[in-house]
């Protein structure tokens, strides 16, 4: 029951957070529009993951939408790092054909974990490069690092690799909800200050609405 409620809360928080990048994607006319579009796709894809999780469709959520959202997140990290400094990076796609749903879920969890580790490396690097805790680059990197750690913890807990004997419930999902609340607050506060005092939401990039 707790896990179902956490999926529902996460979906609501994510949809609220998605309003800002969706609005910016529709209004912006410069290259930053690509960045906000990719961020929007990540948010909505992950929201769908929580919706199917809320309805108990574990195989569809963890086997399709979770790794898909992580792949989009990696793409976002590559594009964002390209705005800061051009860098040649590549992500190899692999296709696995299996027939057993349980085996499929296990393999997709393994693939998701690998993708999460790739994303973790990208955003740790971005956070270290930022060196300014007030910058968008640092704040979104911290959100994603916390989110990734929550996802990895959840996968390891479900797989039985780690056990929290003193704690109840899905610890990874609880960390995930906290990170999404932080993410939503960060987006809305930056949007508020952008509208009120004309400050760019993303430092070094023109986010002026036309």
Q: Language-model features: where?
A:
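Surface-exposed beta-loop interaction hotspot
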Residues: 82-107
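Alpha-helical transmembrane segments of multi-pass integral membrane proteins
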Residues: 44-45, 75-76, 105-121, 141-150
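Membrane-interface helix-boundary motifs at transmembrane edges
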Residues: 25-36, 58-59, 87-91, 127-137
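Alpha-helical transmembrane segments in multipass membrane proteins, preferentially the mid-helix core
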Residues: 15-27, 77-82, 116-130, 185-192
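C-terminal transmembrane-bundle signature of multipass membrane proteins
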Residues: 61-86, 122, 146-210
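Hydrophobic transmembrane alpha-helical segments in integral membrane proteins
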Residues: 1-18, 98-118
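Sequence/structural signature of long amphipathic alpha-helices
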Residues: 29, 33, 39, 134-136, ...
């Amino acid at each position: 029951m707790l896990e179902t409620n956490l999926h529902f809360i996460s979906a609501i928080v994510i949809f609220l957070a998605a309003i800002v990048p969706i609005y910016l994607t529709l209004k912006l006319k410069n290259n930053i529009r690509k960045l906000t579009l990719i961020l929007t796709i990540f948010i909505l894809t992950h929201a769908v993951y929580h919706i199917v999780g809320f309805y108990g469709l574990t195989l569809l959520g963890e086997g399709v939408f979770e790794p898909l959202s992580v792949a989009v997140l990696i793409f976002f990290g590559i594009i964002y790092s390209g705005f800061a400094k051009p860098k040649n990076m590549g992500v190899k796609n692999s296709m696995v054909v299996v027939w057993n749903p349980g085996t499929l879920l296990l393999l997709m969890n393994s693939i998701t974990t690998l993708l999460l580790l790739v994303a973790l490396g990208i955003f740790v690097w971005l956070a270290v490069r930022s060196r300014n805790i007030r910058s968008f680059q640092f704040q979104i990197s911290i959100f994603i690092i916390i989110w990734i750690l929550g996802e990895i913890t959840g996968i390891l807990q479900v797989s039985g690799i780690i056990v929290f004997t003193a704690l109840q419930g899905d610890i990874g999902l609880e960390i995930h909800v906290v990170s999404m609340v932080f993410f939503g607050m960060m987006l809305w506060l930056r949007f508020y200050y952008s509208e009120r005092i004309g400050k760019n939401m993303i430092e070094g990039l023109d986010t002026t609405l036309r």
